[in-house]
Regions:
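Surface segments flanking catalytic/ligand-binding clefts of nucleic-acid enzymes
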Residues: 6-19, 65, 153-315
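Short gly/ser-rich loop at a beta-strand->alpha-helix junction or flexible surface loop bordering the NTP-binding
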Residues: 1-177, 211, 305-315
């Protein structure tokens, strides 16, 4: 969602308007920032990323447009994927602050800002994609950080060189090893946030790294690209985000039933290949149950290189 569209949804409260307070109490208005509301009917269908943008626009509408949108709020404005429940506060960066402070609606990050790390989107100033990815790597989970950088590389929002340069300009040294790990792990071949999160989970569980987007062909032609492929045992793991079934824009005019049949025929062709000895499917809900993912892969013959879930602590 662009800031201009978000701004068009805002209702700017008149001082102590009893009608607005009653509408809010009845659930007809959603309060997104002090003195800023949006109609519940407009709020309900918004994606989490769009809600983050709307809160950010509402917050800056009050703070003034000189504030710099950063972290998760900037990620949402760039169209980067958000993993899990996004924060309820809007992140801005203030180089004049001595320390980071989180209030009811705003998190003000204390960090140096270089002009090269800033850009304008419509009437708002926000951090560049590279700086945003670095900030996310410093403050969010590694799954979120990898999902963001994978997206940046795939969508060509930034390059790895720009990511490393943004890190070099960052004044904070604490947490640098996390940013380095994310940069080394990220790949433009991950086609969705779910694939990014699954890849991080597989690494944490100790499985060997898979080949990403491996092409498969038979006598008819190209079958498609496999999400995760372990050549040494002929195992394919396909991540199924379910959007291809539920969202009309991903079905290419096909019905849900037609998409299911198409996927079944595709999998039949994959299983018929001599190099494919097994196919495992993983969906979003499995990402919250890593032990079940590990068990499914183990049953298919994939052995861990490490035991136990590896965590990457903030340093």
């Amino acid at each position: 969602m662009l800031p201009s569209r978000a701004s068009g949804l805002l209702i700017r409260s008149r001082h102590d308007d009893p009608a607005e307070r009653r509408a809010h109490a009845r659930g007809e208005l959603v309060r997104v920032a002090p003195g800023r509301y949006v109609r519940a009917a407009d709020w309900a269908p918004l994606r989490p990323e769009d809600r983050v943008v709307l809160r950010a626009v509402a917050t800056l509408d009050r703070l003034g447009r000189t504030a710099v949108v950063s972290h998760v709020a900037a990620a949402a404005m760039w169209g980067m994927p958000l993993v899990g429940v996004p924060p309820s506060t809007t992140s801005i960066t203030d180089p004049d602050r001595g320390r980071t402070h989180t209030g009811d609606h705003v998190t003000k990050h204390a960090a140096a800002l270089s002009d090269v790390d800033l850009t304008r989107v419509e009437h708002m100033t926000l951090t560049t994609p590279a700086r945003t990815a670095v900030d996310i790597a410093l403050t969010a989970s590694r799954s979120q950080a990898v999902a963001v950088l994978d997206h940046c590389l795939r969508a060509r929002l930034c390059t790895l060189d720009e990511y490393w340069a943004a890190l070099d300009r960052r004044d904070r040294r604490r947490g640098t090893s996390r940013v380095v790990w994310v940069g080394a792990f990220a790949s433009p071949l991950a086609e969705s946030a779910g694939e990014s999160v699954l890849r991080v989970a597989l690494d944490g569980l100790g499985f060997p790294p898979p080949q990403l987007q491996r092409p498969f062909r038979d006598e008819v032609g190209l079958i498609g690209y496999g999400d995760f492929w372990w050549d040494h045992i002929g195992l394919l793991d396909e991540f199924d985000g379910l959007k291809k079934y539920r969202a009309a824009e991903y079905r290419g005019g096909l019905s849900v039933e037609d998409v299911v049949v198409r996927e079944k025929l595709r999998e039949d062709r994959l299983r018929a290949l001599p190099e494919v000895r097994g196919v495992v499917r993983t969906v979003w809900r499995d990402l919250y149950r890593p032990a079940e993912v590990a068990a499914a892969l183990a049953r298919a013959g994939l052995h861990r290189q490490r035991t136990g879930f590896r965590t990457l602590h903030r340093d």
